[in-house]
Regions:
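Charge-dense, helix-prone N-terminal extensions
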Residues: 1-124
Length: 124
């Protein structure tokens, strides 16, 4: 399975999630909920950028040598870019899944965010 197919399988199961390729960015893919990005990537999905709570973002950057704050000042808001390369192992894809599912509720409307948080056992 290609990296894009894997990422789509993770992101597009979330409520009202869509993939939008940004023409002005040479077709760079994004995943959105109601026009708000929760994942940025490249066409080959060799890296992903996700929004995390600031403390978690700082911890990921401090402990993962393939992670860095996302550029354009987005890192200050908790966005992290992580290299996943081609042929990432299952542990890395599990991390990507967790990060995408963490990013989504941070940008989604509360009613949609709650659905994911409930699925993940994070709210009653």
């Amino acid at each position: 399975m290609s990296n894009m197919a894997r990422l789509e399988a993770i992101a597009l199961v979330l409520p009202e999630a869509t993939r939008v390729d940004i023409e002005a960015w040479d077709g760079e893919p994004t995943f959105r909920v109601r026009n708000k990005n929760f994942v940025f990537t490249d066409p080959e999905v060799t890296s992903v950028s996700v929004k995390l709570p600031l403390e978690e973002a700082e911890a990921v950057v401090a402990t993962d040598p393939l992670a860095q704050p996302t550029g354009y000042g987005m890192g200050r808001a908790g966005w992290v870019s992580v290299d996943i390369g081609q042929g990432a192992d299952e542990d890395r894809w599990q991390q990507v899944t967790e990060w995408v599912r963490t990013s989504y509720p941070l940008v989604a409307p509360k009613t949609l965010a709650r659905i994911v948080l409930e699925e993940d056992g994070l709210v009653d």
